[in-house]
Amino acid sequence: GDVYKRQVYYRESIMIEEVVSVELPVHERLVVRKNRLMNEENGIDMPRISIVTGTHGDELDGQYICYEVIRRIEREKNKLKGIVDIYPDINPLGLDTGSRGIPMFDLDMNRVFPGDNNGAMAEYVAAGIIEDIIGSDLCIDIHSSNIFVNEMPQVRINDDTQEKLLPYAKMMNAQFVWIYSSITVLDATLAYSLNHLGVPTLVTEMGVGNRITPMYCRDIVDGIFNLMSHMGIWDDEPKEVNEPIISTEGEVTFLTAKESGCLLYTSPSPRDTERSR
């Protein structure tokens, strides 16, 4: 389809920019935007962090995290000494329809990176996203789990980037850091592509698909601000964060039900007890 030129919108310290866009049928466009937060008075040569989410349309925790990061920065924007680029939705069609992949194509957005400027629509969009993120000092790729698994806040890194990324991962206020073998990592993911293009990238995972878990989200937001303080992006004292468990390959287990069925409490559930209070 036709490619549209970037458009930039300004609102106080927030600059909303079109990263990449493609024409769709019936006079519509697929548009990926980013919010850039910065204090222009600090100059151009500033540390930069990119926060990316919305790769899968059924993962909503990242939406809350992006909102909360923007809200806190706007509340005390005089403390912002660097550049914060927020990509809240890199799979707009998936988020609009609540589907994990890209509708119509049944394609996982996290399997087309680094993309191709001359490729099909998904590959073209992926290439535009990668090109825009390159130059960041750090990227955080935020995911939720699927609808069948509830995961505690965690940071995932592979073993060939462990030396560079583990210090950052420990600052993220996650409950554990999962270091896994690079052999099991698909090279078409956003994180793999960025790490191999020179942008240190952390993957965070938490919660359940199609839901928002505010407690987990707030923990990760605190971790992001702690990380930004250490990077010189946020002028404030680093936050106290969890000391995560460091897990390597073979040390992580998923607890799953052996039988299908319906869970019934024989006594009031913790939620009902809390409501009665």
Give the label of every model feature segment.
Residues A188-E237, E251:
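Active-site-adjacent mobile loop/cap segments within catalytic or ligand-binding domains
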Residues K34-D45:
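Short beta-strand-to-loop junctions in surface cap/lid or active-site-entrance loops
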Residues G1-Q7, Y265-R277:
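Single conserved hydrophobic/aromatic residue that forms the stacking wall/gate
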Residues G232-S267, R271:
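Generic structural motif
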Residues D45-M46, L60-D61, I65-T189, S193-M206, ...:
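Active-site/substrate-binding loop(s) of hydrolase catalytic cores
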Residues H56:
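Conserved phosphate/anionic-ligand binding catalytic regions in large, soluble enzymes, centered on
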